[in-house]
Amino acid sequence: MRSHDDAAPDSRRGVGGGLTIRLARVHDHLDQQVPKGQWRVLVDRLWPRGIRKDRLELSDWDKDVAPSTALRKEFHSDHLSFEEFRVRYTAELDASGAGEQLLDRARSEDVDEVLLLIAAKDAEHNHGIVLREHLLGR
């Protein structure tokens, strides 16, 4: 999977308060320390399969910002198109306020960059893309 930093020209664009938000696969950050100035957060509801917890250094694991279990299962069973998933997941984020809470925690840590980590294999159709877009709109 390509890094999402390379996928979009605006991928390093910041949000209010100067935070840069990036998206990457968990597997690309195994056995690496969190760099100074970065807040590294796992945004999957489930721990990534096959990854020992001691191999992934995190600043946070935010299960609340992940899609609901029902929505995740419906999307992964191919009952929803990515666009339908995007609409429903965005509605969940709007209703819960979890995205804003994530940004508030990141800002309180006095960091420049938030790295959203996901385990998804599909680089083009995953909740991380929707979450990042949602956060950039805040």
Residue ranges and their predicted role:
Residues R2-R138:
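Residues lining hydrophobic/aromatic ligand-binding pockets adjacent to catalytic sites
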